[in-house]
Design a protein with these regions (language model features):
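Glycine-rich segments within core transmembrane alpha-helices of 12-TM secondary carriers
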Residues: 11-36, 237-249
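A membrane-interface helix-boundary motif in multi-pass transporters
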Residues: 37-59, 253-272
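Multi-pass alpha-helical transporter architecture, strongest
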Residues: 68-75, 271-292
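Extracytoplasmic gate region of multi-pass secondary transporters
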Residues: 102-152, 245-250
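Helix-to-loop junctions at the C-terminal end of transmembrane segments
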Residues: 156-168
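Cytoplasmic membrane-interface "Motif A"-like loop-to-helix N-cap segments
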Residues: 165-177
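C-terminal ends and interior cores of transmembrane alpha-helices
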Residues: 178-193
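A late C-terminal transmembrane helix in Major Facilitator Superfamily
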Residues: 227-259
Length: 292
């Protein structure tokens, strides 16, 4: 999407990646909220979701998988221009190319860590945490996820357009500063004033700030990498930053509660990831209008 977009529309084009994730989260929230309301009524059991109802969304996901495969196979690939110097191209391995851009890869990983930690905590963990530790009804957790999905979908498209007018780094910096400022107060407010309204308010605020930085981060990383290694480099950045620090975010957050014996402990993980991302901004330049 980034390579096929006009130079002044790359932000909006790339924003659809995060926007569709928000749409998927919204759909997941609707399904979870609907099942948590309908299954107990239909079966007469209040524990049906814990017993087997939680498997239903996974079954729906399996049914949707072929559609995703079909959509991916139907997309046109950007065929690179013929390589003029085959000998020079083949002698230079992908590994050596990555080494030449190792600073960009490291900065990309740090940027991705801040973005993905904030995304996983704000979109998915607040609701789960509130249900587990604050004894809030599970359907409020699903409602929080639904709200997060809607904000991500709408917000990503708006931020994408904003990227094209004000740049990437400024939005990332504002996002990171606000997430850092709000990370501990968000958990503290929920611990001291636990209510569904407070949960939804916290999710609304944190997801909004997270989305503000999520779109420009992924765009910036792809723009910093040269075309020859853009796919490989982005995959490496994504696998380390997202799969490890994002995929295990809820586990790390939960373990921090055990280690520090504090319900606000996940704020340290959220704040730490955010600080790493801000550190990378010091060494990253605003990309040129034309891609390499």
């Amino acid at each position: 999407m980034v390579e096929s977009a006009p130079a002044n529309r790359r932000g909006f084009y790339s924003s659809w990646s995060l926007a569709t994730q928000g749409l998927a989260t919204t759909f997941g929230g609707v399904v979870a909220l609907g099942l948590s309301a309908w299954l107990p009524f239909a079966t007469g059991s209040e524990t049906v979701m814990a017993e087997w109802g939680w498997r239903v969304p996974f079954f729906i996901g399996v049914l949707l998988a072929p559609i995703g495969c079909w959509l991916r196979l139907s997309l046109e690939n950007d065929v690179p221009e013929p390589v003029r110097n085959k000998k020079a191209a083949t002698s230079e391995s992908a590994f050596s190319l990555l080494l030449q851009h190792k600073a960009t890869i490291v900065n990309g990983v740090l940027l991705a860590i801040g973005s993905t930690v904030a995304t996983y905590i704000s979109l998915f963990y607040y609701g789960t945490w509130a249900a587990k530790y604050l004894a809030m009804p599970q359907h409020y957790s699903h409602a929080a996820m639904l709200l997060a999905g809607v904000i991500t979908f709408v917000g990503a498209l708006l931020v994408g357009m904003l990227c094209d007018s004000v740049g990437r780094k400024k939005l990332i910096l504002i996002s990171r500063v606000m997430v850092l400022i709000c990370s501990w107060p968000s958990f503290w407010l929920l611990v001291n004033y636990p209510s569904p309204g407070m949960l939804l308010t916290v999710v609304f605020v944190m997801v909004s700030f997270t989305t503000l930085g999520g779109v420009p981060v992924m765009l910036l990383i792809s723009e910093l990498l040269p075309k020859r290694i853009r796919a490989l480099g982005f995959a490496l950045v994504y696998s380390i930053g997202v799969a490890i620090f994002g995929g295990f975010a809820q586990y790390f957050a939960t373990q921090s509660i055990v280690l520090l014996d504090s319900l606000t402990a996940p704020a340290w993980y959220l704040g730490g990831g955010t600080l790493l991302s801000m550190l990378a901004l010091l060494y990253v330049k605003e990309p040129a209008k034309e891609l390499q």
